């Protein structure tokens, strides 16, 4: 059971990282304009 929870946490962290990257991209575009 423990190993399954750890795998799920790793997947969640990856999705959170993607959201952060998207936010930084939007900010860079606004600064470029």
From Swiss-Prot:
Pfam family, one: COX24_C
InterPro entries: Ribosomal_mS38_C
Protein name: Uncharacterized protein Rv0500B
Region entry Disordered, spans: 1-33
Species this protein is from: Mycobacterium tuberculosis (strain ATCC 25618 / H37Rv)
Top-level taxon of the source organism: Bacteria
């Amino acid at each position: 059971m423990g190993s399954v929870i750890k795998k799920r946490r790793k997947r969640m962290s990856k999705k959170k990282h993607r959201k952060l990257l998207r936010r930084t991209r939007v900010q860079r575009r606004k600064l470029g304009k």
